Amino acid sequence: MCDSQALANEAASEDQRTMIGRLFRRSPDPGGRRIARTPPDTVVWAIGDIHGCSDLLRVLLRVILEDVAAHRPQRAVLVFLGDYVDRGPDSKGVLDTLCELSAHREIDVHFLRGNHEERMEGFLVQPDLGPGWCEYGGRECLGSFGINPPEAGDPPELWEEASLRLNLALDPRHRALLASQKASVAFGDFFFAHAGAEPGVPLSEQDPK
């Protein structure tokens, strides 16, 4: 990589860090309104759809970990809201990064299931779902695992082979992460789910779908 390109990449990374850092600035108290709060001495971060963008995920996590180190909250919670895979170029890298983070002792990490994880997991056991999944972003996910996805009109045997290869490519850490996914989680006054909640229905009675 030439020096000018390296400098450009460094500047872009710094711009990303500055932009993300602004998100952590404390907002003024809007007097007269009830403020939703986390449990005492608990800081919660929530990260939405990552969609295979491992590079941006790493930048964001670096800022969060720096914030944890600087403020030392009694409890630091990180909630991922689902849709880790598909569309972006590096679904495998995202899963690898999340697996590494789940072993981090200073942060309580929670993974929620998104519809894209459901699509991928469906393909693992039902290969004929492959064409629909690939139109939905699964093509890029398969590519990140080194799997060349078949085309929509290809014989079922090719989709079965792609499903088998993905099953073999997912290591035990990936499977443990996928198995740990929840439909929702709550901390204090905050309720987290991938696609929101049905208005008028108590949270305890929400349909996970």
Where are these regions (language model features)?
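Feature recognizes metal-dependent phosphohydrolase scaffolds
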Residues: 2-209
